A protein has these predicted regions:
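Glycine/proline-enriched, intrinsically flexible loops and inter-domain linkers
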Residues: 1-182
Length: 182
């Protein structure tokens, strides 16, 4: 679209939603001792930033093109045995530009029962940053890891061990236009 209409197409954004599908308890975490943990499966709706537009900044923590918003963490915590220890904007993750890219988010998620759980990851923009347009800078790539620093895959089912919460850094959108014109 950018090649056909460069003055109308936004910079690149987070791409797909960052919806961690979490599950735990008997039979749901194949390589972990689950003990008497409560069985659960829950999908969380969260995302990073959109790309900046030709005349406006990108939207922070908002999906493009649908505009899907985030699920309040209190809802997730009330329906599954998880606790969200952190949910912040990922400062400066949007690319610089005359119009800056939207910022991503940082989330840290653990079991409220101190039990292992699993994540079914399907995240994009981990290896390739959302590109800026017309001189705008790229947004930050996403990260999927444990709070201990162990890097996880951005695709596939993986176990989050007891006592080492999941740490997600969602991408920021690319900037649009020369940052010196801001």
């Amino acid at each position: 679209l950018h090649q056909a209409m460069p003055d109308k197409a936004p910079a690149e954004g987070t791409s797909c939603l960052w919806n961690p599908a979490l599950m735990g308890g008997h039979g749901l975490v194949p390589d972990a001792e689950f003990g008497d943990a409560t069985p659960f499966a829950v999908g969380l709706f969260h995302t990073g930033g959109t790309g900046a537009r030709p005349l406006k900044d990108g939207l922070s923590a908002t999906a493009f093109p649908s505009g899907v918003r985030n699920t309040p963490v209190e809802i997730n915590e009330s329906i599954a045995p998880i606790i969200v220890w952190r949910k912040d904007y990922r400062m400066d993750s949007g690319g610089a530009g005359e119009f800056r890219g939207g910022t991503g988010q940082i989330m840290e998620i653990a079991s409220s029962e101190n039990a292992p759980f699993a994540i079914a990851a399907a995240f994009d923009r981990v290896h390739h940053a959302p590109r800026g347009r017309e001189g705008g800078l790229d947004g930050f790539t996403g990260r999927v890891e444990l709070t201990s620093g162990e890097i996880l895959r951005n695709k596939g089912t993986q176990t989050i061990p007891r006592g080492d919460p999941l740490h997600l850094e969602m991408p920021g959108g690319g900037g649009y236009g020369n940052p010196l014109k801001r």
